[in-house]
Every structure is written in C-alpha cells, then in structure tokens.
From Swiss-Prot:
InterPro entries: PyrdxlP-dep_Trfase (IPR015424), PyrdxlP-dep_Trfase_major (IPR015421), PyrdxlP-dep_Trfase_small (IPR015422), Ser_HO-MeTrfase (IPR001085), Ser_HO-MeTrfase-like (IPR049943), Ser_HO-MeTrfase_PLP_BS (IPR019798), SHMT-like_dom (IPR039429). Belongs to the SHMT family. It is found in: Cytoplasm. This is Serine hydroxymethyltransferase. The modification N6-(pyridoxal phosphate)lysine is found at residue 222. Coiled coil: none annotated. Catalyzes the reversible interconversion of serine and glycine with tetrahydrofolate (THF) serving as the one-carbon carrier. This reaction serves as the major source of one-carbon groups required for the biosynthesis of purines, thymidylate, methionine, and other important biomolecules. Also exhibits THF-independent aldolase activity toward beta-hydroxyamino acids, producing glycine and aldehydes, via a retro-aldol mechanism. Its EC number is 2.1.2.1. Homodimer. The record marks 221 as: Plays an important role in substrate specificity. GO terms for molecular function: glycine hydroxymethyltransferase activity; pyridoxal phosphate binding.
C-alpha cells in the first residue's frame, strides 16, 4: 500500500494486535487467507442489483455464477430449500424478515437483551423496538436457562405475530422444536437468529432450526469463520420470494459481490470434514475454559456452556464487567463486558464478562492452552492490584501467542 502509508501502517498495527493478543470476543473469529483473497478481489468493482439472471445491470454473467454458487452452497450446508446471501449483516437480515412478515405495530417476542438477546430482537433503542410492539422472555432465575413453560405463558399472554429464538450471550442449546410448538399455538411466525452458533449448526453439533422455523437468519463470521456479512435461510420457498423482495429493493441496494464470493468460500470450507473437527474443539475448549474459571471461584452463567460462549458472573468476586474488561485488556486479552441475567448494573457497567472460544481455536489452541488461559484470567481478576502477577500474565500471553501463531504465512 505504497500509495497510502497512513492506512498501511494502521492495517499493519491491527495485524500485529491480532497476532499478539488473545482474542476472546465471542462474536469474532479469524477468516482464512482464501476468504480474505476473495473479499479483496476485483469483484469489489461490480454493481449487480437484483438476483442471479435477474439483474438491472449488464456484465453480470460471472457475478451470477459466483452468487448462485454461494446460494447453492448455503442451502446444502444448512439443508435449506431457499437462501439469500445478499444481506450486509445479521441486522440487515433481520430487518428484511420484519419487512416481509410484519406490519408496523405488530407484536414481536424475543429474548430480553440483558438475559442474552440481541438489539434487533425488540430493544427500544433499535428499529425493531420502535416500529413494533415488543415483549420479551427471560431465563429462569435459578437455572439461568430458558424455561419453555414460562415462554409459552408469555406468548399466550401477548399473542405475538413473530417469535424470535436466538441470542448474543446465551451459552446453552435452544430447543427449536419447543419454540415451534409455542409459535403454532399462538399462530406466530418463528424466526431463528443463529448468528452465534451457525458454525455449530452447520457441523451438526447444535440442533438445526431449519425443520422448525419459518425463517433463519445468521451472520457469516463468528463460528462460521467467513467474512463479516449476513445470510437468510428458509425451508419455505414462498416465504423466500417475499424475503428476496425485502432484501432488494426493500432494505438494500446493490449487493457486495466481493463479500458474497468470500461467503461462498467460507461455505465450502465449512462443508469439509475438518470444519466439524474444528467445531468440536470450539465447544470442548469453551467447556475447559468454563470449568477452569469455576475451579478458581468465578461464577459462570448457567454453570457451563454447550457452545462457544462462556459468560462470567462477576458478582461472585465483587467486580463489575467494566473493571474486568479493562483488567484483562491490560494483559493483552480482548473480551467484552456484558450484562448477566437479572443484572443490577447498567449496560455501560454490567456485572458480566463475555468470552468466546472460536477465534483462539482457529489459532490452534488446545484444551491445555485454554486451561492456561482460564488461569491467566483468574489470576488477573482475583489479584487486580498485584503488579507482579500482571507482568507475569503478560509474559504468559506472549508465550501462548508465539506458540500458536495466527497466520503461518504473510498476508
């Protein structure tokens, strides 16, 4: 990037940060070189409004082939009858669903944000909470898991037009079949937002929502390890036609075909047997991390995990998420403060710290390494004012980063 040394320097600095820090943000992962090559290709030059073979621009004969390949691979990977690969993000995918299935003022029901839901599931600060009436279900106070009987009662009381099952900070499996039964009882559409667990679903390590849900949305990064983007799936091709129109021209203009090509590459990677092995390690590594932190006296929401998410409840050690976030950041561990169920703190402070295993598993971290990471985090959080432990932790992080390099060749 000789033409722009300022940007080149910042990109190199970011690469160095990724290489020298432990990435534990649950929504992040490391894309392959092949994915990045596709996204950084000449496809960024091409406008292609419309769908394959139904474009509003000329010169799309190769673009059509790329997008159709992405569609076919997505359908095969998830066992869907229909797919749209154009959404720029998971939020855009959800907006398209709302536009196609709802009218302003309809009621939607999703998981409460402070209990692990997402902004686009009816939060008052999001369009989903401004255009629609909302009601939210929570986790059980004792188990910190979903209580399907309580969710059923909430649905009957509020009669939502759309029920959303999905999360951004819930470490347990979702019973899509039970959600389907509730949706049928109140005559509601059922949307599964699997942004966090898409890679685990694709690998067969989490139950699939496709047989039970009217629509499924996801991002294409996180556990799926592709480019940052969105995807919509359905078993119902008639609903799919509505969704196509809701994506374009309903909520977006021209698709990002260079990103769609990168999605196609990621779908191909996720269909390989090696990806299932990777996904199994994502789960087992998260469980090792969860177990080690609990051994050190740090509470974990729901007392464990079935996926890549480990959510620390720091009330057990008298600490806020904001403080913990800074403490681990000081030793080159990247995480994020997060609310926990029935959190007394504000979203800007929180009582939780959210961790995820996907990115470090991509680097090759094994169970022993994750046990080490758990001890490093516990040492720091339990001894926040000990400078010797802080310096020792920084050295241990550096040793792990050198042992498990991010990219084995220049990018």
């Amino acid at each position: 990037m000789k033409c722009d040394p300022s940007i080149a320097k910042l990109i190199n600095n970011e690469l160095s940060r990724q290489e020298t820090h432990l990435e534990l943000i649950a929504s992040e992962n490391f894309a392959s070189k092949a994915v990045m090559e596709a996204q950084g290709s000449v496809l960024t030059n091409k406008y292609a409004e419309g769908l394959p073979n139904k474009r509003y621009y000329g010169g799309c004969e190769y673009i059509d082939g790329i997008e159709q390949l992405a569609i076919d691979r997505a359908k095969n990977l998830f066992g869907a009858n229909w797919a749209n690969v154009q959404p720029h993000s998971g939020a855009q995918a959800n907006f398209a669903v709302f536009l196609s299935l709802l009218k302003p003022g309809d009621t939607i029901m999703g998981m409460d944000l402070s209990h692990g839901g997402h902004l686009t599931h009816g939060s008052p600060v999001n369009v989903s909470g401004k255009w629609f009436k909302t009601c939210h279900y929570e986790v059980d106070k004792k188990t910190e898991m979903l209580d399907m009987d309580a969710i059923r009662k909430k649905a009957i009381e509020n009669q939502p037009k759309l029920i959303i099952c999905g999360f951004s900070a819930y470490p347990r499996k979702i019973d899509f079949k039970a959600f389907r039964s509730i949706a049928d009882e109140v005559n509601a559409y059922l949307l599964a937002d699997i942004a966090h667990i898409a890679g685990l679903v694709a690998s067969g390590l989490h139950p699939s929502p496709i047989p039970y849900c009217d629509v499924v949305t996801t991002t294409t990064h996180k556990t799926l390890r592709g480019p940052r983007g969105g995807l919509i799936l359905s078993k119902d091709e008639e609903i799919g036609k509505k969704l196509d129109k809701a994506v374009f021209p309903g909520t977006q203009g021209g698709p990002l075909e260079h990103v769609i090509a990168a999605k196609a590459v990621a779908f191909q990677e996720a269909s390989a047997p090696e990806f299932k092995i990777y996904s199994q390690k994502v789960i087992s590594n998260a469980q090792v991390l969860s177990n080690q932190l609990q051994k050190r006296g740090i509470s974990i929401v729901s007392k464990g995990t079935d996926n890549h998410i480990v959510l620390l409840d720091l009330r057990s050690i008298g600490m806020t998420g904001k403080v913990a976030d800074q403490l681990v950041s000081d030793i080159k561990i990247t995480a994020n403060k997060n609310t926990v169920p029935f959190d007394p703190e504000s979203p800007f402070v929180t009582s939780g710290l959210r961790l995820g295993s996907a990115a470090l598993t991509t680097r090759g971290f094994n169970e022993q390494a994750f046990e080490d990471v758990g001890n490093i985090i516990a040492d720091r959080l339990l001894n926040p004012n000990d400078e010797d432990i802080k310096e020792n932790s920084i050295n241990k992080v550096s040793e792990l980063c050198n042992k498990f390099p991010l990219y084995s060749e220049n990018i």
